């Protein structure tokens, strides 16, 4: 697979879980003999939801809820077949969204 690059994007609501997953991916691929660039922290996406507390009136009383989506980027430069195989068999938590592009 000379000249190719695998790009992995991780997304999660919990920053500790995403950092552990990124570390696990980097260790697994490095042990398989490929070179890794990252994990690169991407900007955190912040989604704010504003809800009126009262069901009828008192519009000035509002509650703010916030969802933060943490993102990381990992590039695998010149992946070996062993690295790709180990990447496919890695166990990661369910709350981490993974996108893999060749």
From Swiss-Prot:
Name used for this protein in its record: Small ribosomal subunit protein uS10
Cross-referenced SUPFAM superfamilies: Ribosomal protein S10
UniProt keywords, alphabetically: Ribonucleoprotein, Ribosomal protein
UniProt organism field: Bifidobacterium adolescentis (strain ATCC 15703 / DSM 20083 / NCTC 11814 / E194a)
InterPro entries per the UniProt record, alphabetical: Ribosomal_uS10 (IPR001848), Ribosomal_uS10_CS (IPR018268), Ribosomal_uS10_dom (IPR027486), Ribosomal_uS10_dom_sf (IPR036838)
Entry keyword Ribonucleoprotein: yes
Highest taxon of source: Bacteria
One Pfam family cited in the UniProt record for this chain: Ribosomal_S10
GO cellular component terms given for this protein: ribonucleoprotein complex; ribosome
Functional description taken from the UniProt entry: Involved in the binding of tRNA to the ribosomes.
Flavoprotein listed as a keyword: no
């Amino acid at each position: 697979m000379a000249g190719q690059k695998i790009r992995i994007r991780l997304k999660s609501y919990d920053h500790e879980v995403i950092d552990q997953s990124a570390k696990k991916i980097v260790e697994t691929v490095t042990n398989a003999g490929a070179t890794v660039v990252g994990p690169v922290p991407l900007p955190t996406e912040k989604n704010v939801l504003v809800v009126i507390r009262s069901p009828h009136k008192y519009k000035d009383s509002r509650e703010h809820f916030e969802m933060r989506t943490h993102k990381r980027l990992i590039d695998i430069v010149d992946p070996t077949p062993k690295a790709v195989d180990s990447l496919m068999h890695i166990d990661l938590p369910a709350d981490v969204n993974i996108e893999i592009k060749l």
